[in-house]
Amino acid sequence: MIAIIPAFNEEKNILKVLKDLEKLRVDAVVVDDGSKDNTSKIVEEFAKKAKINVYLIRNEKNEGKAKAIEKGTKFALSLNKYKYIIYIDGDYQHKPMDIPKLLKKLEDTNADAVFGIRKYKHIPLHRQISNFFASILTSLAVLIYSKRFYFFRDVQCGFRIIKAEFLKDMKFGDGYAVEHFIALQLAKKGAKIVEEYVSVEYHDEAVSYITTKKILEVAKQVIKFIFLE
């Protein structure tokens, strides 16, 4: 397995993510999306002594989460040696130590992808509301786009494990619609998608970049995608 980790100014958190992955013997691709802090330096220093393979892709300027995930995924696929690809953010809100639980759910159900679900009591109210509408929108979009019914309870959760074979030729969209785009295309390919609860911790260093404007932009992109593809 290999984890794709988009990171932007995560010098306070990225090392914790990598250390947990090392304990699990999970390789990592960190995509530093134009950070102005020491994120890349920390990754480089860790990689020198790590017991896992740690790859660093550095964008000179911030290109957005979708582009970061796209670059990381294409790189991981080019290595041609991983059955599963994990997606987890670099802010340590999600815990890598939940990976075994996600993998067990994936294998026990013979699924092709497992999406993390955050318990609502751990999510700020404004995020609960935006996530509810985003999940409804994406579930309806999937039905229109793939002619298959899926109900996603937490489509905005970026913590996922997906079989590498389903990520070939994947379109990642732009900005914060990336999780939605991946869900749409997995459904179109007939992938079996299951969900599993994961831990989440909102802390002072973890900054939310989601705004109402961005949520509306995600909706616009999803609608545009299903009718133009």
UniProtKB/Swiss-Prot annotation:
SUPFAM superfamilies xref list: Nucleotide-diphospho-sugar transferases
Pfam families for the chain: Glycos_transf_2 (PF00535)
Lineage: Archaea, Methanobacteriati, Methanobacteriota, Methanomada group, Methanococci
Any one Gene Ontology BP term: protein N-linked glycosylation
Protein name: Uncharacterized protein MJ0544
